[in-house]
Amino acid sequence: MTSPLRLCVRRSTAPDAEGAATLVTLRLPSDVTCIEEAVELVTRHCLAGHAATRTIRFRLQVVLSEALANAILRGNRESLDKWVDIRAELHDEVIRVHVTDQG
């Protein structure tokens, strides 16, 4: 079975207008079984090529897990016909994560 996740990664040596050097977007269904894979994909691609400490990696994984669980369980009420979108932006000193549900 193929994964229902839709991943897009954009890396730039020159930051875009918003200053993001790495942009990772991911769309997943409102299924809690997809959370682990989504967290792994976003973390791996967002931090690839950067000297992130174990603490930063762990914190990003916790933030993503909690935000996705909230979006799926509370926002979309586990409705499988709804999606959750993640946008992670890696700037020089900051990682911004946006999680959007359809609820």
Locate predicted features.
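Conserved short strand/loop->alpha-helix "switch" segment adjacent to the catalytic nucleotide/phosphoryl-transfer site
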Residues: 40-65
